[in-house]
Amino acid sequence: MKVIKTLSIINFFIFVTFNIKNESKYSNTFINNAYNMSIRRSMEESKPPTGAVAGSGAGAGSGAGAVAGSGAGAVAGSGAGAVAGSGAGAVAGSGAGAVAGSGAGAVAGSGAGNGANPGADAERSPSTPATTTTTTTTNDAEASTSTSSENRNHNNAETNPKGKGEVQKPNQANKETQNNSNVQQDSQTKSNVPRTQDADTKSPTAQPEQAENSAPTAEQTESPELQSAPENKGTGQHGHMHGSRNNHPQNTSDSQKECTDGNKENCGAATSLLNNSSNIASINKFVVLISATLVLSFAIFI
């Protein structure tokens, strides 16, 4: 009987020790899981909504970019393009591409042949028609066409001195049409200086001036693209918000701060799981101790 009692007591202690170890492991894992869940919940509550931040950043970027693009582009396209086109006596360009094509090309062609050098036109023979190229897109091409037209006019004036009386009539018609176009230009472009096309001016000085005036229009057409790039502030705000969010990712809630201070009464629902798990572990240990004392008392006194 004594051997049975001793063996039962030894088995009981072994069972109690294993049970306590298992309960402690289970309680520790439960506590760790509950703590991790509470931390995750508090982090989700403390984080700002990332979708709203990204949306506001993109909205600011697209707004600034659209304002710069449409505003400056529309001003440079419609304002400067229309001025260059109508000033040359051609169709007014409505866009930025029409400024270089129709505006500047028509300046070199019509200015060289008709308006700038009418004296050389009077000396030109009817057998040699005026050949001027109007399909120019750059300022260098405009300058080259103007110089070529001047050289041709000068050569015609030297080689054909006899055809003055025959060609003056169409030149007078050209002068009348040019005067009408000048009146229309003055009415349309009041802010710009009108191009002088008098019969007394034999040197084509208006062509380089208009070629130089067409150069800022090309620069103005390229300026909205350059201006719209630094005003796109969407990416900076987007990265700044993410950076500020990543700088302090471990913001704890007020309930966790109060729990760390020791005020367990003010703990939230997330940390109540910790108290429940610790209470369950302590209750299990208490039950094990009571059962151990009862078994020992029966084994000793029986």
UniProtKB/Swiss-Prot annotation:
Pfam families in the record: MSA_2
Location of the protein in the cell: Cell membrane
Sorted UniProt keywords: Cell membrane, Disulfide bond, Glycoprotein, GPI-anchor, Lipoprotein, Malaria, Membrane, Merozoite, Repeat, Signal
Keyword Ribonucleoprotein: no
Residue ranges of Sequence repeats: 55-60, 61-68, 69-76, 77-84, 85-92, 93-100, 101-108, 109-113
Low complexity: compositionally biased ranges: 125-150
Positions with biased composition (Basic and acidic residues): 151-167
Residues where lipid is bound covalently (GPI-anchor amidated asparagine): 276
8 X 8 AA tandem repeats of G-S-G-A-G-A-V-A, as annotated region: 55-113
InterPro entries in UniProt: MSA2
GO BP field: cell adhesion
Notes on the domains: The N-terminal region appears to be involved in lipid binding.
Annotated protein name in UniProt: Merozoite surface protein 2
Lineage start: Eukaryota, Sar, Alveolata, Apicomplexa, Aconoidasida
